[in-house]
């Protein structure tokens, strides 16, 4: 009988690698804020504007253990047909992931990594809207697990159609 745990991962010298996730860097790749109607759009309003938020996550390998995970947040505030502001943030992180079985890599990259990046990206968006003359936009927490499941279902449906 073997004493080895199922799914055990070995490092290059044959020793068992301890599972680890480290953030090597975080960075703003792109940040834009537009307020096309300013200063008129800054006046007090009787009702809150409609705010649409889009979120996207991408991950790319940099090496065998390092991955670039990019969180894109787009927010647009509209009052009737007037665009009050439009902001976009592309925020990335370089993650070193070791000792994780391959079958757990996608959930780690598309759920846990963006979950770690989100509070920083949220603060940048809040600061940008506040500095633009509006109340800070505090984006609600995002369910990255649900986003990942939806993404996997869409990819599965696409591959089923191609078959």
From Swiss-Prot:
Q: Which domain of life is it from?
A: Bacteria
What GO annotations for molecular function exist for this entry?
unfolded protein binding
A single GO BP:
protein folding
Gene Ontology CC: one annotated term:
cytoplasm
Give me the disulphide-bonded residues.
none
- Where, subcellularly, is it found? Cytoplasm
Q: What functional role does this protein have?
A: One of the proteins required for the normal export of preproteins out of the cell cytoplasm. It is a molecular chaperone that binds to a subset of precursor proteins, maintaining them in a translocation-competent state. It also specifically binds to its receptor SecA.
> Member of which family?
Belongs to the SecB family.
Looking up NCBIfam families in the UniProt record yields:
PRK05751.1-3, secB
Q: Assembly and partners?
A: Homotetramer, a dimer of dimers. One homotetramer interacts with 1 SecA dimer.
Mind telling me what this protein is named? Protein-export protein SecB
Give the species: Brucella anthropi (strain ATCC 49188 / DSM 6882 / CCUG 24695 / JCM 21032 / LMG 3331 / NBRC 15819 / NCTC 12168 / Alc 37)
């Amino acid at each position: 009988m073997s004493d080895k745990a199922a799914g055990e991962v070995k490092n290059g010298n044959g020793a068992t690698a301890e599972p680890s996730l480290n953030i090597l860097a975080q960075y703003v790749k792109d940040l834009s804020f537009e307020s096309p109607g300013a200063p008129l759009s800054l006046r007090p309003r009787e009702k809150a504007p409609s705010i649409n938020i889009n979120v996207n996550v991408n991950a790319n390998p940099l090496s065998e253990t390092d991955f670039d995970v990019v969180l894109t947040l787009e927010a647009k505030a509209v009052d009737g047909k007037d665009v009050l502001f439009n902001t976009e943030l592309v925020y990335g992180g370089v993650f070193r992931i070791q000792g994780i079985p391959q079958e757990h890599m996608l959930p780690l990259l598309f759920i846990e990594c963006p979950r770690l990046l989100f509070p920083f990206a949220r603060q940048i968006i809040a600061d940008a809207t506040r500095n633009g003359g509006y109340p800070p936009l505090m984006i609600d927490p995002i369910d990255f697990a649900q986003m990942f499941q939806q993404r996997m279902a869409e990819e599965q449906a696409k591959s089923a159609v191609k078959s």
